[in-house]
C-alpha cells in the first residue's frame, strides 16, 4: 500500500495531494487488516463512478450504501434527511490533513480510507491526542461559515461509468474555517515536519501543517438545522451493529417513535443553546458539551462506516478455509455476527412494559452513560436492562419499592417522570430526571460503606435531567472521601429516597423522619409516598462538597466560570418511577465486586436476575418457616410474647435477622 514511498521520498517537492495519498496508504496499512482492505476495495470499486482514471463516490452512492435517508420526505420536514450532512462531513474528512487546501475532497478510495479511520475510532494508532483532535475535526466537518461549494454534478453529465465530479486543486481556497489566520507565523520547515510525520506515522504533526494557527476555527459555527438532522440520525441508529442493515431502523419508524426521537433531539439541543440559535453552535460550546455531557454521541458513526469493511460479494467461509487471508479470532467473531439476523433487544424478556424507557431514551442514555470498561457505550458493550420496579406496575409504595429494588444486587438506572410545579401557576412542563447507581442499593439498617473505583467512569454514579432540557452531573472523583452522612443513595420508609443528599442524624423523637437536604452540585429527593420529588442542580458554589460534580453544560465552561452561586430547585409531581437493572452479558476484564457476591441464600448464581429470584424464594421460605413456628408457639398473649422473645434471641426475627 505504498509503504516504501515514505522513508526515502523527499517531502520538499511533494504536493498536498501526493502527501495526502501517502498518508492514506499509511492509514490503510496501519489501521486495517488485509481482509478488511479486501472487503473495502470490493465495496468501493463495485459502486464507484468513473471519470477518466478517477474512481469516486458521490452523495447518492454513499447514502444508498449506508442506508440513510437522502432527500426523503417520508419522515417529514427533512428532519431525517441526513444524507447531505454525512456527505459534507466525509468530503471534509477525506481531505485530512490538508483541509485548508483540499477540502471539499472527492471521495476517492484514498479519501474513503481516511474517512473510515477517523470515524471508526481507528485513529488511535496515528492521532496521538486522540479525542480532542477528533472533536475538532468533527466540528470542522459540520461548520457552515466559510464553507465553499463543491462544483455540482449536473444530471446531463451522469452515466453509469462517467459522471462529472467536483474539481479540487491545491491552489484553490478550501474551507476558510481552516485557513491560518496569521501567515506571518509560517515556518520554512513545514515540509520537513510533514516528511518526519509521514516517516513516524505521527499524524498530528501532519495535521498541524494545515492547521498552524487556526484561530478562525473558533469563529465558525454549526447551524442548529444541520446538527438537528445529524442528531436525529444518531438517535434512530444508536443500537446499530456493524453488519445490520441501517435501512431497517428507518423502516420500523412510526409516528410515535418519530415524535419521541424529535423530542429527544430537541432536549439534547438545549445543552448547546446558550443564546440566539440563529448564530449556531461555536467551537467552544461544541467541544465542552461533547467532551463533558455527550462523550459517546458520535459512536454510531463507527458501526455505520464499518459497513464498508463487510462485502456481500465475498465468500468469507471460502477465504477462511483456503487460508488466503490471516483472520484473527476477533475477526472470526465479527464474521459470525455478520450472518446473524439481528442483535438481541437491550430490554430483557419478562420485564414490565415501560412507561418512560423507550428507544429514544435508551439512545439518549447511550450518548453519555458509561456502564462498563473498556467499552463504555451501553448499546455496544453487551449491556441488557431488566425491569426491577415500576410504580405503574408494582404500585406507588415504598414497601413494594423495597421488595423489588433492595433485592437487586447489581447496578441500576432510576428514571422519574412528572410535571414541574411552577410557582407562577404556568402550564406544567413534563420533566424526566434520573440517576445511574453503579452499586446495589443498601438496606436502611446497613452500616457498611461503599467503595467506588474512581479509575473507571462506569463505577461512578450519574445524576441527570433528560427533559425538557438536558444536563448531566457525574460522580465526584473524591466520592470515597465523603463523610458517611453523604451517601450516594439513601432509602428510608419515613424520609423517602435520597440521591446525593446530606442525611441528618436521627433524633430521639423520630429515628429517621428528618428530611435529607441538598448537597454538592446535584441531588434528587423523592417523598415516602412516591408522589413528589425535588431535583436540585447547582454550579457547585451554592452547596458544600457532595456526591456529584457541576453539570457539564455550556454556560459553565472553563472559559466562562461561574462568578456567583447559581442553584435551581425543581419541584416535581411524579407520574411514574422506573428502576432498570443493568446486566452485563459480555465478559469484562475485571469483574466488579457485586458480581461475586454469594451467600447461603442464593449460592453461586450467574446473573443478577436469577440471584434476585433466588433471594425472593429464600424470603418466601423464611416467611413460611416463621409462620409455622408462630403457630406452634400457642395462641395466648403471654405465650405469644414468650414465643416472640425466643425467636428474637434465635435471630430469626427482629434487627438481628435483618443484618444476617
Swiss-Prot record:
Keywords: Cytoplasm. It comes from Arthroderma benhamiae (strain ATCC MYA-4681 / CBS 112371) (Trichophyton mentagrophytes). InterPro entries: TLDc_dom. May be involved in a process influencing telomere capping. Residues 355-583 form the TLDc domain. The keyword Endoplasmic reticulum does not apply. Residues 157-172 have a biased composition (Basic and acidic residues). Belongs to the RTC5 family. This is Restriction of telomere capping protein 5. Residues 150-187 are annotated as: Disordered. GO terms for cellular component: cytoplasm. It is found in: Cytoplasm. Its main location: cytoplasm. It comes from the Eukaryota.
Amino acid at each position: 500500500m505504498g509503504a516504501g514511498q515514505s522513508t526515502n521520498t523527499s517531502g520538499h517537492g511533494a504536493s498536498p495531494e501526493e502527501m495526502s495519498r501517502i498518508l492514506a496508504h499509511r492509514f490503510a496499512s496501519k489501521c486495517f487488516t488485509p481482509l478488511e482492505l479486501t472487503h473495502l476495495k470490493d465495496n468501493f470499486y463495485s459502486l464507484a463512478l468513473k471519470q477518466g482514471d478517477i474512481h469516486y463516490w458521490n452523495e447518492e452512492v454513499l447514502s444508498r450504501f449506508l442506508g440513510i435517508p437522502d432527500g426523503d420526505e417520508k419522515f417529514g420536514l427533512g428532519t431525517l434527511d441526513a444524507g447531505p450532512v454525512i456527505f459534507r462531513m466525509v468530503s471534509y474528512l477525506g481531505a485530512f490533513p490538508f483541509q485548508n487546501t483540499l477540502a471539499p475532497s472527492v471521495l476517492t478510495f484514498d479519501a474513503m480510507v481516511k474517512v473510515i479511520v477517523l470515524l471508526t475510532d481507528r485513529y488511535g494508532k496515528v492521532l496521538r491526542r486522540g479525542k480532542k483532535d477528533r472533536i475538532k475535526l468533527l466540528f470542522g466537518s459540520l461548520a457552515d461559515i466559510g464553507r465553499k461549494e463543491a462544483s455540482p454534478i449536473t444530471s446531463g453529465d451522469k452515466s453509469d461509468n462517467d459522471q462529472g465530479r467536483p474539481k479540487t486543486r491545491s491552489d484553490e481556497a478550501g474551507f476558510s474555517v481552516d485557513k491560518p489566520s496569521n501567515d506571518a507565523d509560517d515556518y520554512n520547515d513545514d515540509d520537513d515536519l510533514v516528511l518526519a510525520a509521514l516517516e513516524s506515522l505521527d499524524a498530528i504533526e501532519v495535521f498541524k501543517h494545515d492547521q498552524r494557527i487556526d484561530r478562525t476555527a473558533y469563529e465558525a459555527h454549526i447551524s442548529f438545522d444541520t446538527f438537528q438532522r445529524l442528531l436525529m440520525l444518531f438517535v434512530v441508529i444508536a443500537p446499530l451493529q456493524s453488519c445490520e442493515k441501517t435501512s431497517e431502523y428507518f423502516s420500523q419508524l412510526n409516528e410515535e417513535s418519530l415524535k419521541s426521537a424529535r423530542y429527544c433531539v430537541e432536549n439534547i439541543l438545549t445543552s448547546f443553546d446558550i443564546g440566539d440559535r440563529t448564530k449556531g453552535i461555536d467551537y467552544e460550546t461544541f467541544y465542552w458539551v461533547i467532551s463533558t455531557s455527550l462523550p459517546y454521541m458520535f459512536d454510531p458513526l463507527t458501526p455505520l462506516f464499518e459497513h464498508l469493511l463487510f462485502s456481500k460479494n465475498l465468500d468469507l467461509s471460502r477465504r477462511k478455509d483456503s487460508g488466503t487471508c490471516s483472520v484473527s479470532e476477533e475477526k472470526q467473531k465479527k464474521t459470525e455476527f455478520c450472518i446473524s439476523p439481528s442483535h438481541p433487544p437491550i430490554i430483557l424478556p419478562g420485564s414490565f412494559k415501560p412507561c418512560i424507557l423507550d428507544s429514544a431514551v435508551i439512545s439518549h442514555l447511550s450518548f453519555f452513560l458509561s456502564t462498563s470498561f473498556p467499552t463504555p457505550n451501553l448499546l455496544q458493550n453487551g449491556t441488557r436492562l431488566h425491569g426491577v420496579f415500576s410504580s405503574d406496575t408494582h404500585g406507588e409504595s415504598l414497601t413494594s419499592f423495597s421488595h423489588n429494588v433492595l433485592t437487586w444486587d447489581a447496578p441500576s438506572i432510576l428514571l422519574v417522570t412528572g410535571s414541574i410545579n411552577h410557582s407562577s401557576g404556568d402550564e406544567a412542563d413534563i420533566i424526566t430526571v434520573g440517576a445511574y447507581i453503579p452499586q446495589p442499593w443498601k438496606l436502611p439498617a446497613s452500616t457498611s460503606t461503599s467503595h467506588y473505583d474512581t479509575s473507571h467512569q462506569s463505577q461512578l454514579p450519574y445524576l441527570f435531567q433528560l427533559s425538557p432540557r438536558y444536563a448531566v452531573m457525574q460522580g465526584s472523583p473524591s466520592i470515597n472521601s465523603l463523610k458517611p452522612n453523604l451517601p450516594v443513595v439513601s432509602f428510608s420508609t419515613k424520609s423517602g429516597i435520597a440521591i446525593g443528599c446530606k442525611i441528618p442524624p436521627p433524633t430521639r423523637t423520630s429515628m429517621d423522619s428528618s428530611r435529607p437536604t441538598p448537597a454538592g452540585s446535584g441531588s434528587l429527593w423523592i417523598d415516602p409516598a412516591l408522589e413528589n420529588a425535588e431535583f436540585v442542580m447547582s454550579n457547585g458554589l451554592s452547596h458544600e462538597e457532595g456526591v456529584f460534580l457541576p453539570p457539564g453544560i455550556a454556560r459553565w465552561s472553563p472559559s466562562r466560570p461561574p462568578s456567583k452561586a447559581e442553584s435551581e430547585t425543581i419541584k416535581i409531581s411524579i407520574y411514574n418511577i422506573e428502576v432498570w437493572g443493568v446486566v452485563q452479558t459480555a465478559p469484562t476484564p475485571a469483574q466488579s465486586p457485586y458480581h461475586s457476591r454469594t451467600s447461603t441464600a442464593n449460592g453461586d448464581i450467574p446473573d443478577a436476575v436469577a440471584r434476585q429470584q433466588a433471594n425472593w424464594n429464600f424470603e418466601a421460605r423464611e416467611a413460611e418457616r416463621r409462620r409455622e413456628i408462630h403457630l406452634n408457639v400457642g395462641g395466648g398473649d403471654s405465650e405469644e410474647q414468650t414465643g416472640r422473645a425466643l425467636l428474637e434471641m434465635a435471630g430469626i426475627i427482629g434487627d438481628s435477622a435483618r443484618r444476617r
